[in-house]
Amino acid sequence: TIEKYLDAGHGACPLRSEQASACVADELAALADWQIDVPHYAIMPNHLHAMLVPGRGCVRSLSAIVKRLKGRSAHGIRLLIGGRGAIWQREWFDRWMRSDAEYRKCVDYIRNNPVKAGLVARWEEHRWTR
């Protein structure tokens, strides 16, 4: 499928480098400043899967959180790799989890994304998956 082709790191892959992936991981960790926990994520060569869990004190909208994450990480990546143009696509997709089963399914999906893409044999082998 086209998803497997893209997930495997073909085409434009601005997150392929260790430095770019580290930049995204740092920005995910920095969301704690806004009382957002990020218990699970997978930084793929050309996209990101992340579980964002707002704390009780979080007053930011999901849109503002994603805007901050994309903006700050794009700025950092551009400083690293140079060039022009977008790092992230404009759109993004969310999923609200209403049960433990949905939560577990989402965690499994995030963790297994690098495996399904053929990047690693087990999710634990992928440096940028939590």
Give the positions of each predicted feature:
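Short catalytic/metal-binding and nucleic-acid-binding patches
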Residues: 1-130
